[in-house]
Design a protein with these regions (language model features):
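Bacterial N-terminal signal peptides that target proteins for export
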Residues: 1-9
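Bacterial signal peptide processing site
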Residues: 22-24
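Mature extracytoplasmic domains of secretory-pathway proteins
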Residues: 49-100
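Short, non-transmembrane alpha-helical segments in secretory-pathway proteins
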Residues: 28-61
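Extended hydrophobic/Leu-rich segments
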Residues: 6, 42-45, 77, 84, ...
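C-terminal partner/receptor-binding element of secreted or periplasmic proteins
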Residues: 106-137
Length: 137
């Protein structure tokens, strides 16, 4: 009887440890916006929807997607920031246009961005806000 009790306790302990150690992200997604000529770009721009799905599945990083708008042309661009904690604080920032073309890249561990490219990406841009995040507690 004692042996069965100890085995049961052991199984309960292992299951509890595995379940409690599984990290699940807190996800924020603003589906109530229009950008790049489409309602809900997080779903209706295939490349952006793919980035969101990858972010939801990532186990070692956090993702923030911000929406910006050119104050002259009114075109939208997206700023994607990836933050990794497990190897120290590492971040990478990408800028994309509506079609998913990379316009800008910077971050720790990358070749420093060309200052002209960085300036051009942020020139005349108005920050409209965060539209998607994954955060781990």
């Amino acid at each position: 009887m004692k042996r069965i009790f100890l085995q049961t306790i052991s199984v309960v302990f292992v299951v509890t440890a595995v379940v409690s150690c599984t990290r699940k992200p807190t996800i924020y997604a603003n589906h109530d916006i229009t950008a790049c000529g489409v309602k809900d770009p997080l779903v209706n721009l295939p490349w952006l929807a793919e980035e969101c799905e990858k972010a939801k599945k990532a186990k070692n990083g956090e993702t923030t997607i911000s929406l910006l708008q050119d104050t002259v042309t009114k075109d939208n661009v997206f700023k994607l920031m990836y933050y990794y904690k497990n190897k120290g604080d590492i971040y990478i920032i990408y800028g994309y246009n509506c079609s998913g073309k990379e316009l800008y890249r910077s971050g720790l561990g990358l070749t420093p961005p060309d200052s002209e490219i960085e300036e051009e990406f942020y020139k005349n841009k108005k920050y409209l806000g965060i539209i998607f995040t994954t955060k781990y507690k």
